[in-house]
Amino acid sequence: MKIRPTICCAALLALCSCNTTPQKPQHADALSLSNPVTRKQAIKTAYAYVNLKWEATSNNRLHGLDPNGQHVDTPDADAAPQLGSAMWWKPGTNYGMPYKWGGFDTPEEFLLRLAQESPVYAGDYASDSKVAGGDDAVSSYAAGIDCSGLVSRCWNLPRPYSTRELGGLCVQLQDFSELQPGDIALKPGTHVILFDSWVDDAHSVFYAVEAGGVPHWKCYRYRISIETLKRLGYTPHRYKNIR
C-alpha cells in the first residue's frame, strides 16, 4: 500500500493545532461498542485519508459566509499570506483530505460532495471563532474531517466522537511503549492522533496519522516522540473493540 510520508519536525505545533473539538455528549453509548474493527482495517482507513487524491477548483474556496451564514475559511494556499503557511491546497490535483471543523466525511463522500454543482467548500480550519462556537460553528457546506472524526472513522464508529468522549471507549495503557497500530495518543478536549508504527526498536518515536494543522490543515503521516507527547499531557489509549 502506497504511503505519502510526511515527516513533521514541528510536531509540537501539530499536536496543539486543533484546540477543542466540537463538543458532543460526553457519555459513550453502548452502540459504539458493537462495531469491532481490526488493526489492519484501522490503518487502511487512515491511509485512505492521507493518500486521497482529489481535484479542486476555485469554487471550492471560501473565506466568508456560506449560504447558511456560517463563516468558513478553507485551507487553500491563496489564504496563506493572511492565515499562515498551513493553508495549502490549490486548484487542480491535491493529496490528503483537508481538515474541516466538525467534519466526518468518508473519502467517498468527500469526492461525491466536491462533484456536486451546489456550493461545497474544501475544508474549514480550526480558527479561534470555530473553537469558541463549538458545534454551532460547523458548516454543512464545508467538506472534510477533523482529528476525532478521523479516529472515529478508523474505528468504524457510527458517529463522530469528540476528544472528550473517545477515552470512554478505551482502556488507558500503562505506558506508551504498549501502543499498537490503531491505538491513540489522547488529550481530551484538545486533540487526538492515531498510532501507526514504531520508528525505532527503543519505542521512543513512532509514525502517527492525524487530521491536524501543521504543516498543513489536512490528513497526514509524520513522526512524533514519546517525550513530546508526555510533555504535552497526552496519554496512550486502546479502543475496547479493536482486534
Language-model features: locations:
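Short alpha-helical patches at coil-to-helix transitions and adjacent helical residues
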Residues: 144-148, 179, 237
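C-terminal motif of bacterial Sec signal peptides marking the signal peptidase cleavage site
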Residues: 15-17
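Extracytoplasmic low-complexity repetitive segments enriched in small/polar residues
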Residues: 42, 72-75, 210, 220-224, ...
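Sec-exported extracytoplasmic/periplasmic mature domains
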Residues: 51-55, 152-160
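Bacterial N-terminal signal peptides that target proteins for export
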Residues: 1-8
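Low-complexity, Gly/Ser/Thr/Pro-rich intrinsically disordered linker/tail segments
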Residues: 219-243
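...with weaker cross-activation on analogous glycine-rich loops/strands in unrelated enzymes
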Residues: 157-222
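N-terminal capping segments
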Residues: 22-148
